[in-house]
Amino acid sequence: GSEMCIRDSSYTVRDKETDVELEVDNQYIMSPKDLKTIHFMNKMLDAGVRVFKIEGRARGPEYVRTVVECYKEAIRSYLDGTFTDEKIAAWDERLKTVFNRGFWDGYYLGQRLGEWTKNYGSAATERKIYVGKGIRYFSNIGVAEFLVEAAELNVGDKILITGPTTGAVFMTLDEVRVNLEPVQTVKKGEHFSMKADKIRPSDKLYNCLLYT
């Protein structure tokens, strides 16, 4: 939602979710949509751009990881001559999982008008549901122990582990054990173990679900 204050020929739009104010003057506005330039990175590199800044303030670690990975792959593809429509489509699908408000191209391709998002809230294709926290890591066998504090998990679920040092780790839950016995589902209040790269106590565990 938004609130509008009329000021002569210009006005200010305030986003209720973020409290961000956008100045609108004649036909020039700033867009609350997420700026995406990956599909014409080749043109930007051809033009001599050599530094790209990824905005990630107030975003989760999964956003930072996914965006940086995609743009890094795009630059490498440009350099080795494999920057293709197929790769762009694949990057777009990955970016859609973490972007919140839809995409626009900014003014890089000559548009005068900005774009307002049509979606209230998030337009990401995936949402993360908090499951629980890390308890300990057994480095000698590569096993992590977690406590389920909220939503249950099932074998086959896509999960996300985040933490200040761990960063963002995506994986599929292939096997899970409770009291050393394999189970299909872990529920609130249960401690469970699974194979994982190193995690830290208090790392957060999420279930990644597709929006329906």
Regions of interest found by a model, annotated:
Residues K36-G60:
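Long hydrophobic segments that form regular secondary structure
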Residues G1-S9, Y211-T212:
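Conserved small/polar residues in nucleotide/adenosyl-binding loops
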Residues F40-M41, R59, Y120, G132-G134, ...:
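Generic recognition of flexible, low-complexity loop/linker segments
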Residues E126-L210:
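Beta-strand/loop-dominated core regions that host nucleotide or nucleotide-derived cofactor-binding catalytic loops
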Residues V24-K36:
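Active-site mouth loops of central-metabolism enzymes
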Residues M4-C5, Y11-E17, L22-V24:
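Active-site loops and adjacent core secondary-structure elements that bind or stabilize anionic groups
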Residues R57-I129:
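Anionic-ligand-binding alpha/beta catalytic cores of soluble enzymes and soluble regulatory domains
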